[in-house]
Amino acid sequence: MLGNQDAVVTIAVKDLTVAQKFYEDKLGLKKVDLGDSGQEEEVLSLKSGSSRVNVYRSKYAGTNQATAATWVVPDVDGTVRDLKAKGVAFERYDLPEMNHEGDVHVAGKLRAAWFKDPDGNILSLVNP
């Protein structure tokens, strides 16, 4: 039933203006016009590939301690370099079976990196 449908990532933030700057300027996502939906004050919808990332205003922003969204990218190391050049700071986690190569966590062929948005939501990159 849902296997052929796109999913939308939904992330809670405190300040939509701050979130918009981060997701557009740092990550390169593009704002989606919601038309006359009346949601523009509370929800920011962003295009990421063929997916959407919706950020919404919430007093619970940043309280999730797990990864909120993951981007599958062909070159994790190159994407990390590009994001660092835009001021994105990467996290370092001690995970079983994983080694570190700079900001990239490595386990066999798996390469992954984690970073946070301004509200502390955990975001990640992983190779296909």
List the model feature ranges, each with a label.
Residues 18, 76-80:
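Short, conserved charged micro-motifs
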Residues 11-14, 61-62, 104-106:
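Alpha-helical interaction segments
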Residues 1-20, 66-69, 126-128:
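N-terminal beta-strand motif that seeds the catalytic metal site of vicinal oxygen chelate
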Residues 30-73, 91-92, 116, 122-127:
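Conserved short beta-strand elements that form part of the metal-binding/catalytic scaffold
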